[in-house]
Amino acid sequence: MNFITLLDYVGTFAFAISGIRLASAKHFDWFGAYVVGFVTAVGGGTLRDLLLGLPPFWMQNVSYLVVSGFAFLFVVGLRKYVIRLNNTFFIFDAVGLGLFTVVGIQKSIAVGYPMWVGIIMGTLTGAAGGMLRDVLLNEVPLIFRKDIYAIACICGGLIYYLCMYLDLPAAPTQFIAACSVILIRILACLLYTSPS
């Protein structure tokens, strides 16, 4: 398993938890909670693949269904702690956002698209799953609220390409870019509220 695949699976796990956790807090049944988690985990990547002219990734590899299932078991097993702690959603959402941004950029590079497409696809991969989650839960999507969400993905994409320009190896580039998205998202929520 290469580093980008590991990021993809960890991102799937984290985003699925964020969706399942919110669905459980809204008293969805188990099947509904799993569906929300799965859509959160694969929604952005599915839109990305369709725009890039590729078959959706999860239709070629059952492991994404399995990873989402493990996320479901994690939330069910620790539901008393996961649902009650407000910051659990935020933490898993930030991690998924950062990791999926990098996965989206890397996939765009692999099929030969230029930098600006990579940044857009990274942002879409990171943010669209959360947007679909919020729509399913009848919430205003985070991307449209005062939170710094898509901007964090764009900044991470720029950092990714800066690392490439500096000839850093692939794994450190991916790690730095993912961490930058996570850090920007966390700092923005802790320290800053965007203008009304």
Give the residues covered by each predicted segment.
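Helix-coil boundary and interhelical linker segments in multi-pass alpha-helical membrane proteins
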Residues: 1-3, 50-58, 105-117, 163-172
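Structural signature of hydrophobic alpha-helical transmembrane segments
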Residues: 2-10, 57-69, 115-124
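Cytoplasmic-side transmembrane-helix entry/capping segments in multi-pass membrane proteins
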Residues: 32-36, 62-64, 86-96, 145-151
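Small-residue-rich segments of transmembrane alpha-helices in multi-pass membrane proteins
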Residues: 37-42, 94-106, 148-161
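Loop-to-transmembrane alpha-helix initiation sites
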Residues: 61-65, 114-119, 145-151, 169-178
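Ordered, amphipathic secondary-structure segments that act as subunit-interaction surfaces
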Residues: 71-107
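Conserved small/polar residues in nucleotide/adenosyl-binding loops
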Residues: 192-196
